[in-house]
Amino acid sequence: MARTLSFQQAINEALDQEMTRDESVILMGEDVAGGQGAEGEMDAWGGVLGVTKGLYAKHGDRVMDTPISESAFVGAAIGAAASGLRPVVELMFNDFLGVCFDQIFNQAAKFRYMFGGKA
């Protein structure tokens, strides 16, 4: 019998399944771990929409809160991918994607050529 899931539940379940299956999958974003490990940590809400709720408890340090600098953590994810990890980045809202374009178009897109095909 088919299950009915909200988008939030489907994304959470897919992330959980893939992080369980593959240790190289990491998750980065603002408040995705609810400040876990920080002084005054709170119950992990799971990002602004609750999509990552419960993932820190299950996968620990592979779920990472980031500073409010989308370009920085997208750049970090690109570097992580170049080193063999499989990063998933949660941007709070699609409006913030534009500030990441430099990392995507001017950095990641040229890695192969900048590093002689070794990245």
Residue map of PLM features:
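Thiamine diphosphate
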Residues: 1-119
